Swiss-Prot record:
It comes from Danio rerio. It holds the Pfam family Complex1_LYR. Belongs to the complex I LYR family. PANTHER family: ELECTRON TRANSFER FLAVOPROTEIN REGULATORY FACTOR 1 (PTHR21024:SF0), GROWTH HORMONE-INDUCIBLE SOLUBLE PROTEIN-RELATED (PTHR21024). One of its GO terms (biological process) is respiratory electron transport chain. InterPro entries: Complex1_LYR_dom, Complex1_LYR_ETFRF1_LYRM5, ETFRF1. One of its GO terms (cellular component) is mitochondrion. This is LYR motif-containing protein 5B.
Length: 84
């Protein structure tokens, strides 16, 4: 029987992998950590726990997006405004 969360987990993995390209410590570092995190939970069968892990992954996606937006904002502010 196929796991009903398979597509959602794959989408989350792809989204995180895409966001990891601009990670401050480097894409290779991020990719290794991401792969290890997903491999650690590969045998999970409890639907409630899987939902919880997916929610946590979506939270990480939002945090990474916020990190990147903040970094871009700081770079623009640094270029166009004088130091206070």
């Amino acid at each position: 029987m196929a796991n009903p969360f398979r597509a959602e987990v794959k989408q989350l993995y792809k989204a995180l992998l895409f966001l990891g390209r601009e990670y401050p410590k480097g894409a290779d570092y991020f990719r290794e950590r991401l792969r290890a995190a997903f491999a650690k939970n590969k045998d999970m069968r409890d639907p409630d726990k899987i939902k919880q892990l997916i929610s946590r992954g979506e939270f990480v996606v939002k945090e990474l997006e916020a990190l990147y937006y903040l970094r871009k904002y700081r770079a623009l502010k640094k270029r166009y405004y004088e130091a206070e």
